[in-house]
Amino acid sequence: AEKPNDPLFTRKFIPAKLSDNPYLLHSGEYEMMLLSLPELERKRLLEGDWDIAEGAAFSEFNRFHHVVDPFDVPHGWYRVRAADYGYTSPSCVLWGALDHDDNLWIYRELYIKRQNGDELGIKIREMEENDPPPIVSVLDGASWNRTGTGLTVAELINKSGCMFIPADKNRIRGKLELHKRLRVDPESGSNIKIFSNCVNLIRELTSIPLSKTNSEDVDTKASDHAYDALRYMC
């Protein structure tokens, strides 16, 4: 029986690619037309990939190539950690691992508001209790700014035992490094993989737009907390 608050209609997205339609695929002409389209339209109509928003900064991001199901990260892989701090806006902490081929695997995220530096540091330690220590741990530069006589946000976080160092401030260089990692090689694939439980990072990578005033950067007014943490890591 229907309940008062039940939706009248539901939708389910079923992705479809040209390869799913043998008639159109074998004609050849339709495929040539799709290949000539701009990148975003081509990805949608030829590859059935509707993840990327119009004007998104990372149009090469693709769930098939870049998102994987979680697994137990081997202890022999080097661990890395990066964080972008916010209080009224979210803080994001990302945990990654580098395998022996320098592929970067993002396996955990923390996305949380209204945490002081010491509170965030304690939460980080709790979440990584069973992890090997990271070889690199970086935190946004603004967290090191001193606004009064007390400890900075970075000092409060480090006091908990996390031990961050300042992240590279160069926004353009970090974005370019991420583009390199997202690039898909026909034989080896991409050298960045993101666990499917990192939902906020995936959301931002599919939607964050380019800046309207600087085409080399993203729009800093958009939700970019997980993106910034990833940029620091790259």
Residue ranges and their predicted role:
Residues 90-97, 231:
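Short beta-strand scaffold segments in enzyme catalytic cores
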